[in-house]
Amino acid sequence: MSTPATPTSCDILVFGGTGDLALHKLLPALYRLHREDRLPADTRIFALARSALDNAAFLALAERNVRAVVARSEFAAEQWKGFAARLDYLAMDASQSADFGRLARHLKSSEGRVLVHYLATSPSLFAPIAQNLSIAGLAGPQARIVLEKPLGHSLDSARAINQSIGRVFDESRVFRIDHYLGKETVQNLMALRFANALFEPVWRAAHIDHVQISVNETLGVENRGGYYDHAGAMRDMVQNHLLQLLCLVAMEAPVRFDAEAVRNEKLKVLQALKPISGLDVQDKTVRGQYAAGRIGGQEVPAYYFEKNVDNDSDTETFVALQAEVENWRWAGVPFYLRTGKRMARKCSEIVIQFKPVPHSLIDGGGGPANRLWIRLQPEERISVQLMAKTPGKGMQLEPVELDLNLAEALSRNKRRWDAYERLLLDVIEGDSTLFMRRDEVEAAWGWVDPILAGWREHYQSPRPYPAGSNGPEQAQLLLELQGRRWLE
Amino acid sequence: MPDVRVLPCTLALFGALGDLALRKLFPALYQLDRENLLHRDTRVLALARDEGAPAEHLATLEQRLRLAVPAKEWDDVVWQRFRERLDYLSMDFLDPQAYVGLREAVDDELPLVAYFATPASVFGGICENLAAAGLAERTRVVLEKPIGHDLESSREVNEAVARFFPESRIYRIDHYLGKETVQNLIALRFANSLFETQWNQNHISHVEITVAEKVGIEGRWGYFDQAGQLRDMVQNHLLQLLCLIAMDPPSDLSADSIRDEKVKVLRALEPIPAEQLASRVVRGQYTAGFSDGKAVPGYLEEEHANRDSDAETFVALRVDIRNWRWSGVPFYLRTGKRMPQKLSQIVIHFKEPPHYIFAPEQRSLISNRLIIRLQPDEGISLQVMTKDQGLGKGMQLRTGPLQLSFSETYHAARIPDAYERLLLEVTQGNQYLFVRKDEVEFAWKWCDQLIAGWERLSEAPKPYPAGSWGPVASVALVARDGRSWYGDF
């Protein structure tokens, strides 16, 4: 792949332009990029949706949503006016090819302009949109397509989508989003691992006892019940975010920090994941579904009472599982993955638990082995837990933490940027390092599908857990049976 | 506070009215009493040459103690209890007849600890007289530095003491070993697999050990001008720190297991050949300059100065350890008086990653460091590379410290003074924080060859202005190897 460069002219077409993702995430991110002069000078933004709005009505809707999202100090009328001048709305039905002809005429000449087609729509529309873009002459060499999750529902459906997209766009022009990869601390993982000689010699089975990766939310499904009930936590979170984090922890050093080299290494990890199938699902996985409980002092309803959720749904809102990477570096090291909704705390975290020292000099044992904590949210931080001498007389040990609170360490002048700003900028510049490649997505589905099949075949229903807890008790057992426990 | 067994003894403090005793030992004993770490039967005998009424001397002692102990830690009830333990005895340490009185003052049932806060030249005489008076049985002796001024004189002192006391009852003090963070070095190294795995020449590029003092000679002319910074600081404190950093894991925490490993390091120190002295060692002597914004005199201009002295007040040197673990890893040692600040610090520089994948212009930034701050503000800091914040192209890196500051983490806990810990260990009979005879002698042997080399060179110490980090040559010493001192300037 050639070195990414910033184009001078760019058209961004947002399909699903009046949807939540567009209004709450994409437009605020684009506004911020505009405000900081990071967009190409000649950028046009087209919001496309079925709603019969005129341009003025759309601009009013956009302004209301951007104001609600960005900080008051970041919103200025003059800047909004400049941004609004870039914005255009076109009502169209993305499933109708005739509308794409109209779209092409609306764009006028796109010669020499980068085209970014952002599909903030249902995945069922991905294939028709790609096909129609091609027919309308909007899928030329300068065109890129951005796909939001979910990318299918299974390996077969993901493959079908990828094949349809692949017929129109070659892989270098497809940008599959996992917004987790745009987060600051996720990117810090790369720097931590490959810019520090200190960690690399211990980053292997000989020194690491196990790895824990948790992505816990206090929120329930809210308005996404209809989608979520069909997907479940495994498809919604594990197949993408958690496996991506696992890849970043477990991957080998790439030869260069560029898209293909990095994604090659991630793919190798996914290919090395030991399958969990058949009866293994009972030993290696735990499913949960939240029941009524209390969060933040508030009573919250059970999952099956949420809007748009089937009353006798057996969809999981919690998954814990033990993954294994069967390669030279990691054989024998369990990776415990955990994710859930309506958990006690919102927390995304990676914990590397090292093995104890080979011989303890201190009577009564040396205490806990070392840990490296990488907190993704809230409060991004990195922490090493060590043993140190208890202050005062005698030689007793106690754990202490060397930590770096990234939010504190960074200059107060610098604004905390959003994952979507990073990702949008990368699409415009053609840098796909932080996006998922086709084979990564398919390999991830290839690993997840047998687990889903195992659950169906063996009638593994989700265990109830009260909202505001740490998930089903069986999740504790998963680790306790091997002499370990979840940390926080 | 962890539970510590407290044992009774009689502490006979030789040199009780000397500066060390009044500034350090009595305050430490007071603090131990305050924390109930002196057994109720423990007694302290203050011994000095000065004649006169004991009550007078004890009053002087009380005055000095009130000055030395922070006001919030002073407690009259504790003082009264401490006062009850105290007796003063006037005696000439080299007069055998004087020990009759000491013999009568000592309780036969309690072990005796004889603390020599005196010049080493009288250690032998005191030991002989203790033995003659029947006071050597079961007695522990505590020896303050300096123990000699070279290998030969050190041996003489050690042999004079060894005639009457076995090594197991000799406690040679290096007060650095009593510091909290120095002890944490042992925990840090041997209770944490994260570091021990990499504690070798495969992963470590070089090590810096700095012990900098802000003050000048402070009236210690009689001793210091004969000794110089190498004998005053390197032979003991800096080499002890080097041993703790470089030693192999002991099999347990017993005194001799630890000290065996330290001796192995000292034996592996490569002598610096005469032809390499100029490139590997820098001597300095401070000249007039500024400290805390005030003009201060040079060494040769100090009150009572020996005007043609060539004693060094600064030493920087590169030490190599010839063993499997450390071959090829230089240890840069640096110590001096009239430095910009008081600082004792160890910096472990790890090697660069084997293959660099980020932006080429940032390559020079890449290295990890473990910084162990001994004083001031004891703490540990691990410097790692993280991603810089921002939307800039590629992966911009920055150094971020993962750190532990003892004063922050343990703000409620009072960290004891080094002498408190050392005195407690003596009363408990633990030797691991004390220096063994062969340690002292190997350290002198290594220093002696340096001193002999300097004398043959007849080279004067290089001047450096007070308030600077030493002679420019000390920067060149490290720069010659493509490195720089951490954090200077």
UniProtKB/Swiss-Prot annotation, chain B:
GO terms for molecular function: glucose-6-phosphate dehydrogenase activity; NADP binding. It is an enzyme of class 1 (oxidoreductase). Pathway: Carbohydrate degradation; pentose phosphate pathway; D-ribulose 5-phosphate from D-glucose 6-phosphate (oxidative stage): step 1/3. Induction: Transcription is maximal during early logarithmic phase when inducing substrates such as glycerol, glucose or gluconate are abundant. Transcription decreases during stationary phase. The keyword Transmembrane does not apply. It catalyses: D-glucose 6-phosphate + NAD(+) = 6-phospho-D-glucono-1,5-lactone + NADH + H(+); D-glucose 6-phosphate + NADP(+) = 6-phospho-D-glucono-1,5-lactone + NADPH + H(+). The active site is at H237. InterPro entries: G6P_DH, G6P_DH_AS, G6P_DH_C, G6P_DH_NAD-bd, NAD(P)-bd_dom_sf. PROSITE patterns: G6P_DEHYDROGENASE. Disruption phenotype: Mutant is unable to grow on minimal medium supplemented with mannitol and shows increased sensitivity to the redox-active superoxide-generating agent methyl viologen (paraquat). Keywords: Carbohydrate metabolism, Glucose metabolism, NAD, NADP, Oxidoreductase. Its EC number is 1.1.1.363. NCBIfam families: zwf. Catalyzes the oxidation of glucose 6-phosphate to 6-phosphogluconolactone. Can utilize either NADP(+) or NAD(+). Homotetramer. This is Glucose-6-phosphate 1-dehydrogenase. The gene is zwf.
